[in-house]
A protein has these predicted regions:
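Short linear motifs at protein or domain termini
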Residues: 1-100, 104, 213-226
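Conserved amphipathic alpha-helical segments that form helical-bundle/coiled-coil interaction surfaces
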Residues: 91, 97, 104-166, 177-187, ...
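Amphipathic C-terminal alpha-helical segment
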Residues: 162-171, 206-217
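Active-site loop of classical SDR/Rossmann-like NAD(P)-dependent oxidoreductases
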Residues: 173-175
Length: 226
């Protein structure tokens, strides 16, 4: 696992520090989906006692990133087909609200900057960079939708989906995916709510289907890892 992520925690609020470090490891795939979280191992890796690790795991359970069972203990959420369908159903509804708000008052300079970045990555593909850009894209849209509750809910759903998307990235068409983002941006800049919703739906459905395809071809993803 990454030496940087598991660098010793020295900030006073150890529980929050450990929480952020474990969350980062989960979100970036350093701790794979389905992995069991051992308090002993994590406390050794972070060079802290088991108490802040235990508290951090409880906080991760509250976010939905980690499941806690009596028999197996704590483990990272598994990207099952049912999880994927349910989460994308919720996310689509929330993203529709986001683009509706943005069409009413589009942050033009920010959207044009995002557009240029996606245009650039379509010509020079980098999977890791693209994943970061996609997260930043949806985060930027939600933050400028002028609804803090919407932003909070999208962040929560997006964090869970981020675990799954590491598996889907190889199934996403490179150029077409960048064009999907550009099409959404153009619709918002034109204040065309109907088209913005349509393009957002297409984008989310394509990402969802890429993940579902991977899960169907790799059922071992849903096998818990001890």
């Amino acid at each position: 696992m990454s030496d940087t992520i598991f660098a010793p925690a020295s900030i006073p609020n150890l529980r929050e520090v450990v929480f952020e470090k474990i969350r980062e490891a989960i979100m970036t795939g350093v701790i794979p989906a389905g992995s069991k979280l051992s308090e002993i191992d994590l406390s050794r890796q972070f060079d802290v006692s088991r108490t802040p690790v235990r508290e951090a795991i409880r906080q991760l359970v509250e976010t939905g990133l980690v499941h806690l069972t009596t028999r197996r203990g704590a483990y990272v959420l598994l990207p099952t087909a049912k999880d994927t369908l349910d989460l994308y159903e919720i996310r689509t509804a929330l993203e529709f609200i986001s683009v509706e708000h943005l069409c009413a008052n589009p942050p033009r300079d920010i959207l044009l900057q995002l557009r240029g970045e996606f245009d650039e990555v379509s010509n020079d593909w980098d999977a890791n960079r693209f994943m970061t850009m996609d997260v930043d894209f949806h985060t930027t849209l939600s933050k400028h939708a002028n609804n803090s509750y919407l932003d909070f809910m999208l962040e929560r759903v997006g964090a869970i989906l981020q675990i799954c998307r590491h598996y889907a990235i190889g199934n996403i068409p490179k150029v077409s995916s960048s064009r999907e983002h550009i099409a959404i941006i153009d619709a918002i800049l034109s204040r065309d709510v109907g088209r913005a919703r349509e393009k957002m739906r297409e984008h989310l459905e394509n990402t969802r289907d890429a993940l579902l395809e991977y899960i169907s071809r790799h059922p071992e993803v849903a096998i818990p890892k001890e």
